């Protein structure tokens, strides 16, 4: 069964992530001890933005959730998380559904600040909130960061794509999944070099 809770806790009393439902409920945020919020939603107009009282520290990064986007924006978010945690201000990171943008930022933070490789960070979050599904562009950026930080890619784009296919089609055996992947490689890729390991 998929974990569809509004949020999950990554580091107790320090770091949480999820969807916009919790972000709109300041009473629940306060009960969790949240003092800082990162909003990653790309609003079509400012009237849609979630407003927060001034007692929350707030960062809004307007990020489009499309496969062609990279995750270069995540460093600014990780800096904010690091600073807030240092000042004992627990952080809630959210996007619209708590599936792609927020999980990307949390993985970036775990990789750059907690020294976890991409595979470890991804499966940690998958265990906490199994509906996470970062875009291929975000994962490509994190995979490149993985290699930069740790000297090799712990979780390649090909491995991620195969994992996603297997999760979508659990009754199909692995060899058939690989055949589907190879036949549809262009469909699942952003460009021809995305599958280079």
Regions found by a protein language model. Give the residues of each.
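Short functional micro-motifs and their immediate structural scaffolds
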Residues: 100
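Short, small-residue alpha-helix embedded
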Residues: 103-112
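Short, solvent-exposed helix-helix connector turns and helix-capping sites enriched
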Residues: 25, 107, 186-187
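Cysteine-based protein phosphatase catalytic domain of the PTP/DSP
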Residues: 2-93, 97, 112-144, 149-151
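Short, amphipathic alpha-helical interaction segments embedded in low-complexity terminal/linker regions
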Residues: 126, 143-197
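Generic structural signal for hydrophobic residues
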Residues: 105-106, 121, 161, 165
């Amino acid at each position: 069964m998929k974990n569809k809770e509004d949020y999950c806790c990554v580091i107790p009393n320090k770091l949480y992530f999820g969807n916009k439902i919790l972000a709109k409920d300041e009473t629940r945020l306060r009960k969790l001890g949240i003092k800082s919020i990162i909003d990653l939603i790309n609003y079509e107009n400012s009237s849609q933005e979630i407003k927060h009282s001034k007692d929350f520290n707030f960062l809004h990064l307007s990020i489009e959730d499309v496969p062609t986007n990279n995750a270069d924006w995540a460093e600014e978010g990780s800096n904010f998380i690091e600073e807030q945690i240092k000042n004992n201000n627990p952080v809630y990171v959210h996007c619209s559904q708590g599936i792609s943008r927020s999980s990307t930022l949390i993985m970036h933070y775990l990789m750059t600040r907690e020294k976890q490789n991409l595979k470890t960070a991804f499966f940690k979050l998958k265990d906490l909130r199994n509906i996470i599904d970062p875009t291929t562009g975000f994962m490509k950026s994190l995979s490149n960061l993985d290699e930069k930080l740790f000297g090799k890619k712990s979780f390649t784009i090909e491995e991620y794509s195969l994992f996603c296919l297997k999760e979508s089609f659990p009754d199909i055996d692995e060899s058939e999944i690989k055949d589907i992947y190879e036949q549809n490689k262009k469909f699942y890729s952003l460009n021809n070099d995305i599958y280079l390991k």
